[in-house]
Each structure stands twice: as C-alpha cells, then as structure tokens.
A protein has these predicted regions:
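Residue-level signature of mid-helix packing/kink "hotspots" within the transmembrane helices
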Residues: 33, 61-69, 153-154, 267-275, ...
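Helix-to-loop junctions at the C-terminal end of transmembrane segments
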Residues: 67-79, 274-286, 372-373
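Conserved MFS/SLC helix-loop-helix module at the cytosolic interface between two early adjacent transmembrane helices
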Residues: 66-102
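Helix-loop-helix hairpin linking two adjacent transmembrane segments in secondary transporters
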Residues: 145-193
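Extracytoplasmic gate region of multi-pass secondary transporters
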Residues: 35-36, 221-267, 271
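Cytoplasmic helix-loop-helix junction between adjacent transmembrane helices
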Residues: 110-148
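Cytoplasmic membrane-interface "Motif A"-like loop-to-helix N-cap segments
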Residues: 77-87, 283-295
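Juxtamembrane intracellular "pre-TM" segments in multi-pass secondary transporters
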Residues: 2-12, 194-226
C-alpha cells in the first residue's frame, strides 16, 4: 500500500504540491455531493419543490460543462496553479454565500458560481500532475488523485449531516466552505517548482508545442475518442450507481438491505480498483489493453446480474468485481489521454475530455429513468453492459488510429 501512494522519491516541493492538488480534488467531489444529504432540509427552508431545487444542479453542470474547455486553455496560458487556487477560492466563497443568505435565487446563482469554480479542477490538476510527477510514478499519482476524489464523496454525507445536526444546513454549507479555505491555505503555502514549462511562461517565450493549440486540435479523432470514452464511462457509472438498488428490487425483489450492500461493494471495490490500476498501469505499458479488459469484465458481469437472480453472496461479490474492474481502468484512461496530448496543452485537452463527465451525468438520469418508468429494470443492466462494450470499441479504435499515425 505504501508503494501505491508514496511520493517520497520525488522532489519534496513537487510532492507537497501534488498532495495539495489531490486535497483540492477531494474538496471538489465533496462540494459536488453537498446538496444530496441536505436536500430535505434545504427544500423545507426555502419551501420549494424538488424540481425547483434540482435547478441548482442543472445550473452547476451547464456552467461547468460549457466553460471547462475555455478554462483549460487559460490553464495553458497563465499557469495551472493560479487557476486551481482561483477555482477553489471561488467554489468555497460560493458555498459560504449560499449558506449565509436566505434567498432561493441567491442559492441557485451561487451554484452557477460554484460551477465556474469547478471548471478549474480537472484541467489544472492534470496539468500540475503531468508536469511535476516522475514518469515512472505518474500512473500511481493519477490513481491517488482519482482516489482522493472518491474519498471526498465518501466523507461528505456523514460530515455534512453531523454539521447540520448542530448548526443547521446553512452551518453545514459554511463549515464546508471553511474546509475548502483550509485546503486553499495549504495550496497557497506550496509554491510551484520552476519546471521548464513555467520558465517558458515567465519568460514570454513560445509555450511549447501544445500551448498554441485551438479547437481544431481538440476535434481531432484521437481527442474526440477520449471525449467519448469519458462520456460513456460516466453514462454507465452514474446510471448503475443511481439505479442499482431500485432495479434489483423491481427485477428480483432483492431486499433493500442486500441491494445497499451490493452497491457499497461496488463503490468500495471501485476505489480499491483505482489504486491497483495505478500500480498496474505503471508496470504494464499497454494502457489500452488494461482499459479494454476492465470494461469487458465489467460489462459481462453487469449483463450476468441482469440475466440471473443470484444468491445474495454471489450478487455482492459480482457487483464488487464489476466495480473493481472499472476502477482498474481509470489510471490507464488518464495515461491514454496524456499520451495524445502535446506538451503544454494538458489543461485544454483534459478540460475538453472531462466535459464527458458532465455529458454522461446529464444523459444518464433520462435514459435510466425512462427504463424504470417503462418497467424495464432488466434494461438497466443490459444498457449499462452495452455501454461498457461500446466503450471498449472507443479504446480499440483510438489505439488503431495511433498505430496508423
């Protein structure tokens, strides 16, 4: 386990900066999950419907999805650290204001501001990690970065509900903003080491081959394939995570307690798979093979769950296997994107492909919700499995394109 997360062999300044970047990513996921556990309390306070309150998430995702790529260009132009600090400061301020003021429309507006802050994380994070990680440790650093985000999602419900019980939902929002400001202070205390790309930015020289890229480069087939990969993994992951419990109940009459354990198994093993995938991607350079294999296993297992009413222990084991297989692919996914990114263009490229998360997360509730409304719970598993297999085709197509070039 020490090998998975150790950065001791890297320069200490770079190590501390990477730790700060991962902490910021943890906060980004923490912030994204804030509304869910506090939804009932906020709705009662504002006296609005669930649909009206859901507008906050819609505004957040639209702003984040539309502006993430332009912010990626900004990362490559002025530097990733300053953009990350600005994004975290903006997010923290938005949630503090949302908790301080008693207006529903201010609350909605602050989710738009938070969406703007959210655009900084992936472009800036991946740029900093790519520039300040040793190549032989990069896949493990990517894995730990992803794991940090999962950790933020995991601790959000319990800490937010604890703060709500003492200070109300507004106090919970302000407390979360304070957490973000603490991480911000850590980032401010860690200056970015002067790597070659920083020297070029400071001297005003050409910003390396990728710094001047535009939209024409981003719509190249190799980049669009990665956008599709991010979109499809978000589509299958968000849908299955959200609808697994109700689909199992409707299809097989699975008790809610067992279905919840199955979901917990999927999520926990997904996180473990990410860490294992970081080590694997560092040892095996065929990242496309790792991604394709993991998605094939996940798709096959998901289809199996949709076909058969399995004993509880086997169901829990298979959902865990599916989660582990998908998690195994994430570090390789990031390495595949990095492989097609010119030096100096990490912000723009990672910002662009990361919009796939917003696209997939927006489509998933519609498709999976329609399947449940049409009383087709089996379709939840078959659709998720099919998307996983289509995702495999994007990996293999991208690999064939790179070989042809």
């Amino acid at each position: 386990m020490t090998q998975l997360i150790s950065v001791r062999t890297m320069p200490s300044a770079g190590s501390r900066l990477i730790a700060g970047v991962c902490a910021a990513h943890m906060m980004s996921h923490y912030y994204m999950l804030m509304l869910a556990p506090l939804l009932a309390f906020i709705r009662a306070d504002f006296d609005v419907s669930y649909t009206q309150l859901a507008l906050a998430l819609t505004v957040f995702n639209v702003v984040s999805g539309v502006l993430q790529t332009p912010v990626g260009f900004l990362v490559d132009r002025i530097g990733a650290r300053v953009v990350l600090i600005g994004g975290l400061a903006l997010s923290s301020a938005a949630y503090a204001i949302a908790g301080l003021f008693g207006s529903y429309w201010i609350f909605i507006a602050m989710y738009g501001v938070a969406g703007l802050g959210n655009t900084a994380y992936h472009p800036a994070d991946y740029s900093l990690l790519s520039h300040h990680s040793r190549p032989d440790r990069l896949s493990q650093i990517f894995a730990f970065h992803t794991f940090a985000g999962m950790l933020g999602s995991a601790i959000a419900p319990v800490t937010l509900l604890a703060m709500q019980s003492f200070f109300g939902w507004r106090g919970a929002y302000i407390g979360a903003a304070i957490f973000g400001l603490i991480v911000l202070a850590v980032l401010l205390a860690q200056p970015e080491p002067i790597a070659e790309h920083r020297r070029e930015l400071r001297s005003g020289k050409s910003r390396a081959p990728g710094a001047a890229i535009g939209w024409r480069f981003l719509v190249a087939p190799t980049i669009l394939i990665n956008l599709a990969f991010f979109t499809l993994t978000a589509l299958t992951g968000n849908g299955l995570n959200t609808y697994l419990i109700v689909a199992l109940g409707a299809l097989y009459g699975t008790p809610a307690a067992i279905a919840n354990i199955a979901l917990t198994s999927l999520l926990a093993m997904n996180a473990i798979g990410v860490l294992a995938g970081g080590v694997l991607a560092g040892r095996i350079r065929q990242h496309a093979l790792i991604a394709a294999s993991g998605l094939t296993v996940a798709g096959a297992v998901t289809a199996l769950i949709g076909l058969f009413d399995l004993p509880s222990a086997l169901l829990i084991g298979l959902t865990g296997l599916s989660g582990f297989a998908v998690g195994l692919t994430y570090p390789s996914r990031d390495m595949l994107v990095r492989a097609v990114t010119p030096p100096g263009a990490f912000g723009a490229v990672f910002g662009f492909v990361s919009t796939g998360f917003n696209i997939g997360a927006s489509i998933a509730p519609i498709v999976y919700g329609m399947l449940m409304d049409q009383r087709q719970p089996r379709g939840i598993f078959f659709f998720s499995a099919a998307v996983s297999l289509v995702c495999v085709s994007t990996v293999t197509f991208g690999l064939s394109r790179r070989r042809a070039e």
